[in-house]
Amino acid sequence: GQKTGFFLDQKYNRLAMQRICKGKKVLDCFTHMGTFALNAGIAGAVDVTGLDISEYAVSQAEANARLNHLENNVHFRQANVLDELPKLAQTGEKYDVVILDPPAFTKSREATKNAIKGYREINMKGLKLVKDGGYLATCSCSHFMTQELLAKTVKEAAKATHKRLRQVEFRTQAPDHPILWAADESYYLKFFIFQVVDEK
C-alpha cells in the first residue's frame, strides 16, 4: 500500500460493511488491494466492482480475489475514480452499495479548504450512483478533516444531488490505532455509513 500495504486501521470497518452487502451490487472506489470489495464478496454480494488508478494495486486485488475464490463475482478495473464515476452515471449505472475510501485529500491545515471541495466532489459523484434506498460508505483518513467537517461536506453533497441521508453507523480506526486525547493527529479516520433516499 501507499503506507502500510493493508491499512489495518480499516479492518473492523470492512467487517461492518459485510452486514449490508449480501445479495447486493457493490462499487468499491479507490479499492487499492481490494479489501472492501473482497469483504463484500465474502458477505455474499452478487456483483462487486473495484476501481483504482494503480495498475499494480488492481493486479494485487485480482490476485487476492483468486486466493479467496471470489473471482466470479468480484472484479477490478484500473480507472481514475474521479473520471470513471461520471461515465457510469451517464450510462445509467446504479449500485446498492457505493464505498468511497479515497487517499487523504489534505495533509496540512492550509490545504483543508481545497480538500473540502475534493470530498464534496467525490461524494456527489458517488451519491449519484446509489440506488434509492441503497447505501453510501464514505470516509476520510486526514485528521484535519474532522468528523463534523466531513459530515457537513457529505450533507452538502447530498443536498446538491437531491438525496436524503440516514446515518446507519459512524466508525473510526481500529483499537490498535488508538486515539490519544493529547495528540489530535492520532484521530484521523472517520467512517460513515449512510442509507441514501431519493428526494421525492
Q: What would you call each of these model-derived segments?
A:
Residues 56-99:
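S-adenosyl-L-methionine
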Residues 44, 66-71, 159-164:
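Short helix-capping segments at alpha-helix termini
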Residues 95-125:
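Mobile active-site "lid"/loop adjacent to the S-adenosyl-L-methionine
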Residues 121, 135-200:
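C-terminal catalytic and target-recognition region of SAM-dependent MTase-like enzymes
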Residues 17, 40, 119-122, 126-127:
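Class I S-adenosylmethionine-dependent transferase superfamily signal
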Residues 47-52:
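Conserved SAM-binding motif I beta-strand of class I
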Residues 70, 130-132:
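Helix-to-beta-strand junctions that scaffold the AdoMet/dcAdoMet cofactor pocket
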Residues 1-44:
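Glycine-rich adenosyl-nucleotide cofactor-binding module
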